[in-house]
Amino acid sequence: TAAPVVRADRHREDALNWSKRLAEMISSQGPFDAVFIGRTSGQYGVGAVAPNGDVLEGDAAAPAFESATREFVEQIKPATESVVFMRGTQWPYFNVTTCLAENNGAGAECTFPRTRADDALAAAEMRGAEEAYPGHVFQVDPAPIACPTGMPRCPTVAPDGTIIMRDGSHLTTTFA
C-alpha cells in the first residue's frame, strides 16, 4: 500500500518507502501487460496514519487506503495495460491441522467465519484504483473456491476429503 501504515501502534515507514520504490521500479521497467497486486486478509489488522498524525484503525482507515491506492495506480498506469488485485482468502486464525488432529479429522469442528478482516479496506483500494484507471482494473478473488458462497462458515476439509488450509492462513498445495 502507499498508505502510511501502522501495525501494533508502530508507524511503518518501511512499508511506505517500499511502496514508493516499487512504483518507481514498475514505472521505469514497463511496459507490462499487467501488474498484479496481492493482499492478504489477515495482514490488515492494522490502520493508517491520517495527515494530521492520528492513527486510523480498521474501517476508519479505508479513506487513507483508497487515496493511497489511487496515487499508486496513477504512478504505475503509464507502464501497464491492466492492474489486477489478488484478494486473499478468509483466515481461520487458528492452526487448522492442529484442530483437525485434536478432533480426529472432523472438519465440522474446525470451520471458521466467512468474513474477512480486510473487506472494507479491499473495497476502498479497488475504488481508488478504478478512479485512477477506469476500465483497466480487475480483481481475482479465490475466496469463493476456498469458502463456497452460501455456506454459513468456511470449511477446512473439502467434500472430497482434501484439507483446505495447512495452518492459520495458507491453502494446502493439494487444494490449491
Regions found by a protein language model. Name each.
Residues 1-176:
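Extracellular glycan-modifying ectodomains
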